[in-house]
C-alpha cells in the first residue's frame, strides 16, 4: 500500500495490560516502516486507576476523541478493587455498542510447536475463524427485576436479535468463508429451544447463503459444537454465532489452540464508520502485574489482526510468521523469558525478514 499515517488510540488498561501493550507497539513499530506506515499514537488512561480518581469510566469527551482515530489497541480491563461489571460495561461494552463493533472476530489456530490438550491433533487440524455477533443478544442490557428481595423475586435478561443485526454479521461471515480455502460456514445456535431467535438466524443464513453457492453451510446446536471443538476441530472453518454462544465457544477454542495467552481478537466495524478495537482476550491478571511474567503474544497477534483490518495484509503476515517462528523456538529450546524479552525477540524477527 502507499504511505499512510494511521491514528492509533492506545488504552493500556489494568493489570498486565500496559506491559503487553508495550510489546505489541514494539512489534508494530518494527513492521510499520517496511510498509510505508507512519504511526500517530495517543495513549488514554482508562480503567481502574481513572475510576478510583474520578469516578468516571469513559467520559463523553474521551469517547469523542477515540472516535477520531483509525483503530484502538486495548490491553486489559478489570481490577478486583472495582465492582464487577463497572469497567466492563462502562468501557468495553460501551465502545462496542457506540462504535457499532458488531463483529467480534476470534481466530482459533494451533501453531506448530504449541501444545494442545487434545490427543492426536496436529496444527493443520485447528484453523478456524469464529465470527461472533457483538452488539445484541443478552449483552444488550434489556431486562429487569421484579419483587427484589422477596421470595417471589423474578430476574429477566432479554436476548435481542434484530434482522439488521443478524444479517450484517452473517454477511460478514459468508464473505470470510468465501475467501478461505475450505469455503465452509457453520452456524452455531440452539434453535430447538430458542425457537424465535434460532429461526431468525437459520432463515437469514439460508437467504444469504443463496448468494454464496460456493460456501458449504451446516448447523450445530451450541452444546454439540462444544463437543466437536474438542473431538473434531478439523470440521470447522468459519463459525458464525450470537453474542453469548460466541463468548463461550471462543474461550474453548482458545483452550484447544494452546491457551488464552495466544488468543487475539478484533471488535470490528466493517464499514469503517468507527474505529475498530483490537485486544488480547486474556484478563488483566493483577496477581502477576509488573513482574514481567505476562506473555504478550496475544497482544502481538491482535496487532496483526488490526493491520489486516486496515489493509496491510503483508505486514500482518510478517507478524504472524515471526510469532510462528518464535513459538517453534520456544518448543525447541524451552526456557523462561520475560514479557519484554518475548517482545524483543518477535520484533527482531520481523526486522530481519527479507
Curated annotation (Swiss-Prot):
Belongs to the isocitrate and isopropylmalate dehydrogenases family. LeuB type 2 subfamily. It catalyses: (2R,3S)-3-isopropylmalate + NAD(+) = 4-methyl-2-oxopentanoate + CO2 + NADH. Homodimer. Mg(2+) binds at residues 223, 247, 251. Pfam families: Iso_dh (PF00180). InterPro entries: ICDH/IPMDH, IsoCit/isopropylmalate_DH_CS, IsoPropMal-DH-like_dom, LeuB_actb. Keywords: Amino-acid biosynthesis, Branched-chain amino acid biosynthesis, Cytoplasm, Leucine biosynthesis, Magnesium, Manganese, Metal-binding, NAD, Oxidoreductase. Its EC number is 1.1.1.85. NAD(+) binds at residues 283-295. The keyword Acetylation does not apply. This is 3-isopropylmalate dehydrogenase. Its main location: cytoplasm. Binds 1 Mg(2+) or Mn(2+) ion per subunit. Substrate binds at residues 96, 106, 132, 223. One of its GO terms (cellular component) is cytoplasm. Its cofactor is Mg(2+); Mn(2+). One of its GO terms (molecular function) is magnesium ion binding. It comes from Thermobifida fusca (strain YX).
